[in-house]
Curated annotation (Swiss-Prot):
<feature type="compositionally biased region" description="Low complexity">
    <location>
        <begin position="188"/>
        <end position="201"/>
    </location>
</feature>
<feature type="disulfide bond">
    <location>
        <begin position="125"/>
        <end position="157"/>
    </location>
</feature>
<feature type="disulfide bond">
    <location>
        <begin position="49"/>
        <end position="65"/>
    </location>
</feature>
<feature type="signal peptide">
    <location>
        <begin position="1"/>
        <end position="19"/>
    </location>
</feature>
<feature type="region of interest" description="Disordered">
    <location>
        <begin position="176"/>
        <end position="225"/>
    </location>
</feature>
<feature type="disulfide bond">
    <location>
        <begin position="36"/>
        <end position="61"/>
    </location>
</feature>
<feature type="disulfide bond">
    <location>
        <begin position="149"/>
        <end position="165"/>
    </location>
</feature>
<keyword id="KW-1015">Disulfide bond</keyword>
<feature type="glycosylation site" description="N-linked (GlcNAc...) asparagine">
    <location>
        <position position="170"/>
    </location>
</feature>
<keyword id="KW-0964">Secreted</keyword>
<protein>
    <recommendedName>
        <fullName>Perlwapin-like protein</fullName>
    </recommendedName>
</protein>
<dbReference type="GO" id="GO:0030414">
    <property type="term" value="F:peptidase inhibitor activity"/>
</dbReference>
<dbReference type="GO" id="GO:0005576">
    <property type="term" value="C:extracellular region"/>
</dbReference>
<feature type="disulfide bond">
    <location>
        <begin position="135"/>
        <end position="161"/>
    </location>
</feature>
<keyword id="KW-0732">Signal</keyword>
<feature type="disulfide bond">
    <location>
        <begin position="43"/>
        <end position="56"/>
    </location>
</feature>
<dbReference type="InterPro" id="IPR008197">
    <property type="entry name" value="WAP_dom"/>
</dbReference>
Length: 225
């Protein structure tokens, strides 16, 4: 019995000194943290293990058979920190939505644009010759500028009832249609009225009305007695 315990202590010292069975994979792990259970002596060498890929390892409490490719108990040692090797591949940056308004790219339109013809300043509006007219605003289309005219080439010109779109004329034609200025009217001669003279009473006696006499009447045709 004493030889058995001496053998166990000797094997334990060999594992501690030489790295637990020549640095085999399952023998790296030690059984630590709790009390050792009884009956941990299972093998003395790898040949005592029944498995093909098993080795006889010391786990901290005794010698047991373990597979070469598995570990008995998770290691309590700290994991090794691997050095960070900078990658040569470009890193994909995460897309962060921007709070600023995005500027839309300008895309030229394929549809033909309608060019509005604006009359040149040399073209003038025709002269308004009618001074008075009945304005029917139900059929009257006013304008403010030449851009309001729907027909190309027309110009917003003054009219009797306001402004409306008209075709302009050249400056030479405009002078021909200018209205001749009215001549100043000559005032009519004023006739002075003669004031009425007050009537003076006459010194002659007033005329008496004549009364016809009975003899002056014509009795022809009267009844005879």
């Amino acid at each position: 019995m004493n030889h058995l315990w001496l053998f166990i202590v000797t094997v334990s010292c060999i594992y501690l000194v030489y790295g637990q069975g020549e640095e085999s994979v399952p023998c790296k792990v030690k059984f630590m943290g709790t009390a050792c259970p009884l009956g941990r002596l299972v093998c003395e060498e790898d040949g005592d293990c029944l498995g093909v890929n098993q080795v006889c390892c010391y786990d901290g409490c005794g010698t047991t058979c373990h597979n070469k490719t598995t570990t008995l108990i998770p290691s309590t040692t700290q994991p090794q920190i691997q050095p960070i090797i900078p990658s040569t591949q470009p890193q994909i940056q995460p897309i962060i939505p921007s709070t600023q308004p995005q500027i839309q790219p300008f895309i030229p339109s394929t549809q033909p644009q309608i060019q509005r013809i604006i009359p040149s300043p040399e073209l003038l509006c025709p002269v308004v010759t009618v001074r008075y007219a009945f304005c029917r605003f139900s059929t009257y289309t006013p304008c403010h500028t030449s851009n309001d005219c729907a027909v190309p080439g027309m110009k917003c010109c003054p009219d009797v009832c306001g402004k409306r779109c008209k075709f302009p004329i050249n400056s030479t034609d405009h002078q021909q249609f200018q209205q001749t200025p009215l001549k100043p009217t000559v005032p009519l001669p004023q006739y002075q009225q003669t004031p009425l003279q007050p009537t003076v009473p006459s010194s002659q006696p007033p005329l008496q009305p004549t009364v016809p006499s009975p003899q002056s009447y014509n009795y022809k045709g009267a009844c005879s007695t």
